[in-house]
Structures are given as C-alpha cells and as structure tokens.
C-alpha cells in the first residue's frame, strides 16, 4: 500500500556538488560500500560520473589504476570496462547520464 508521510523532515540540503551532477531529468545514486567490497569488472551503456564523498576506492580500468579519495571525480565514457574496491568504508555519488530522450511528438 502506498503511503505519504508528511512532516518527518523539515530541513534538507543537497550538496552543490551532488546538485551539479543531476541532469535536467534524471537521478543521482548514493552508494555505500563496506571495506573490502569489490565491484568486479563491468561496463555501462551510458556515461557515468562518480564523486567520492567519504573513504577511499581503488579504481581500475583497462589501462590504469588509481586510489580515489574524497573530492575526486571519476568520468567514465559509456562502454568503459572498470572495477572498484572499497579500501575502507566508502560513500560516493553516481550519476548515470543517458542520451537525450526524443519527445514522442517528434
């Protein structure tokens, strides 16, 4: 059953970095990984932007590897093969940037 609960949160702010990631229409995901969590090599059909908020990630892609820390931004073009490992608890924002959707009236 759908419920709407009002008045539970009266103050809410969005970090300007997160707000800047939001496309005109879309979403930003907050991901939290426990230390040692590995996301095995994979790809995405759309561009992806990750912003490290807390902790550290070992980020690998074909041809490179880097330890990423708070404030680092990772730009992944669609189809980039990559994996990550949380070196300690890590929190990061992910924006998937799909191609523009054409209007049904076109």
Identify the residue ranges that each predicted region occupies:
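A short, N-terminal "cap"/entry segment at the start of jelly-roll beta-barrel domains
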Residues: 1-31, 40
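Short histidine-centered beta-strand/loop micro-motifs
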Residues: 19-20, 38-44, 85-86, 105
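Short, conserved beta-strand element in jelly-roll/cupin
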Residues: 33, 43-59
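Beta-strand residues in well-ordered beta-sheet regions across diverse protein folds
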Residues: 52-53, 60, 85, 94
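Short acidic-glycine-tyrosine-enriched beta hairpin
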Residues: 63-78
């Amino acid at each position: 059953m759908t419920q709407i609960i009002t008045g539970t949160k009266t103050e809410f702010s969005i970090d300007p970095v997160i707000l800047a990631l939001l496309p005109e229409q879309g979403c930003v995901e907050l991901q939290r990984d426990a230390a040692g969590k590995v996301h095995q090599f994979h790809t995405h059909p759309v561009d992806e932007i990750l912003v490290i908020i807390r902790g550290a990630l070992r980020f690998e892609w074909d041809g490179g590897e880097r330890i990423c820390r708070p404030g680092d931004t990772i730009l992944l073009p669609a189809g980039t093969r990559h994996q990550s490992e949380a070196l300690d608890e890590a929190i990061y924002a992910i924006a998937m940037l799909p191609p523009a959707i054409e209007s049904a009236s076109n």
